[in-house]
Structures are given as C-alpha cells and as structure tokens.
Amino acid sequence: MVKAVVGANWGDEGKGKITDMLAQEADIIVRFQGGANAGHTIVNDYGKFALHTLPSGVFYHHTTSIIGNGVALNIPVFFKEIKSITDRDVPMPKILVSDRAQIVMPYHILFDQYEEERLGGKSFGSTKSGIAPFYSDKYAKIGFQVNELFDEELLKEKVYRVLETKNVMLEHLYHKPLIDAEELLKTLREYREMVQPFVCDVSAFLDQALKDGKTVLLEGQLGTLKDPDHGIYPMVTSSSTLAAYGAIGAGIAPYEIKEIVTVCKAYSSAVGAGAFVSEIFGDEADELRRRGGDGGEFGATTGRPRRMGWFDCVASKYGCRLQGTTDVAFTVLDVLGYLDEIPVCVGYEIGGKVTTDFPVTHELEKAKPVLKVLPGWKCEIRGIKKYEELPENCRRYVEFVEEQIGYPITMVSNGPGRNDIIYRESSLKNDK
C-alpha cells in the first residue's frame, strides 16, 4: 500500500512533520523528486532537524529510507546530512539509493550561482543548489546517473565530452575559471566510494516490497504552485511536485498510490519571487513571521525570511485538486491564536471580476484578494488532542476552510512536535 505526502501551495506547508508522523506506520519512505534546494523541519525526541535530501523517516529503526530515481542527488550534502543526525545520537538509518538517480555535479552549483548573477534583477529566486542546471542536463541527456560512477571507462569519456560544452559557457558566457577534467574525475571517484554501499535497483526493491504487503510512504518536496507545468511558471522548481510524479520518481505503478495526504498551512508563506495574492506586509507580516512555524518563518535551506500571507482558498483548492487529494493535513493552526480576527482569501478580483478559479501567471499577477474576516479564538491550543475540545471559533475556521477548498481536513496540527496532531472526521471524506 502506497501513501503520498505532498504540498498544496508554495512549499513550507509542514510536510516534514506529517511525513515523520505517518512514518511511524510505514515500512519504507521514499523521496521521489527534487534535491537539496528545499528543507523539511522535524521536531522529535532527538531534537530539531532540517533535512534536505534524507527522507523524513530516518529517525525510525523499523523503516528503510530511499532516495528514488527522480531525486537530484548531491552526494556530499547527503553524507553531511547523515553525519549531522548520527552525531546527535540518531542510530544510523537503513538507506538505499537508486542506481538510476542522477548526481548533482559540482559545476551545477557554480552554474546556478553564475546564472543568477548574470540575470541580476530578473533572476528566479534560486536557492543556488544547482537544481535548474541539474535538470537542464538531465533532459539534455548529459547528466550522470549513479550507476555510471561504476564504469571507469564510460565515466572518463563522458566527463571529457561534457566539459567541452561546459567550459565554452564558462569562458564566453560567464567569464569564469574553467573546470579541470582530471580534478572532476577525482571527485567523482570519491563519490563512488561514498555511495557504493547504498546503491541498488530501487524499483525492483519496491516491487517486491509491495508484493510482500509493505507500506510505502512517498515524500514530496515543495508544493503544487512550484510544479513546472501546473505552478506559477516560471517561478517554479525544475521537477514535478505532484503526487502523480511519485510513481515515476520512485519507480512504481501509478495505481499503487491509494492515499494522497496534501498538506496545507493555516496561513500562507512562500520563499522567493513570484505572484502571491494574499501576501501581507509591514508589522502585520513581521508579527506572523516571528510567531510562525517552529521558531519563526525562515527558509530551512536559505534562512531567507519567508513572505507571509493569509490562507488562500483559491490557491489551496487548486493545489489539492492537482494533487488528487484524499486527505488534507492542516498545519500550524496554533500560530493564529494571537489574532482577534483572521482574514481568509476566498476569491481573486481580476479586471473587475471575481473568480475562485486559480488563473495562469500573467492573470495571477493582476489579481487582488477578496477577503472574508473570521473571528479569532485568542487562546493557546497546543496540547489539545480532541477536535471537539478546540475553541468554537477555531473549529469554525477549520470548517470554513474545508468548505471553501472542498477537500476533507482529517488532520489538524496544533504544535511542532510529532504528536501535536488532532484527527477529525469529515463529511467530505465519504463524498470523495
């Protein structure tokens, strides 16, 4: 049985916590796309961790954590992350790496930085993790799969061939130092030694695991609005952020995915440039940013202050639809307890007309939020375990959002810890 955990919005929704929680019941957790460009923050008995490449299940003894073929694998970051958890008394997790996963090369990170410099004010707000150059090479068929590290002759020929192109760009477009082929080969041989114990045919492993009745959790990165096809293009990432891609990025059949848990925040936040209709500014944004998340709303990868906004029903309804949502996990509800009133974006006004459908980018940039103001609950809700024990206005907020987005909210997160979760029945669950 396969479940996916994915984001409805811009990322930063709290997927790491939800995956960490659901991993208690899973046998295998798979990262199926993206790279070290986005982080998952997890708070558990070992402490607080920001993971970028490792799946969120690495804290459990009973699970196998998998880097799927769809991942952009930065090998040094991967091993630095393993060390960062084992240095804090987390037992060495069981990890497998797909032999078909592709490697983030050292020059991908350089090219990412150089291109952002070249674009200046027209840049895409990259985390400079090498992701766009990595995927450009993957689809230009000049990327390096993990399995290619183990064929010395092939590796050498390919390095020299690829660097012919890269060095022309470095010299004539970016005016930067050239890459030495032998130095790069030396680095790749080091990568080979590091990764060798973990490499296997992940697709075959998962096929057998599913035949054996194992539970598999697919862990997505970022959210619907960062998807290159369905997101706010071009302010998107370079790999699909949708649950549908989980089948491709893990190497399993699409029909195996039975449940899709889409994570929504009780307010909105985003890192990087692009249209953000419900965005707030000034003191109002600073206050929400300071109180938000776990220790403030700052990017887990870059440390950049996140842009803040009210909950966006239009974007979230769209995000849930594209994901194929069976359940919504509604996170960081506890953060809003300081507010007398809570605005919610229920529509977009574009050219004098109001819509509840999420538009394409050039229309989105003209959109103004249509807000409905709900009463706050003005109290602390951490520690509450039963939905009916939440303050009435808090329940009304959850139920209003559920009605607007049209997908069942079956989990409500009211704190950063693994067990700060409230399960609820939803009448929409039976309708889906």
Roles of regions detected by a PLM:
Residues 1-432:
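Non-transmembrane, aqueous-exposed alpha-helical and coiled segments at domain scale
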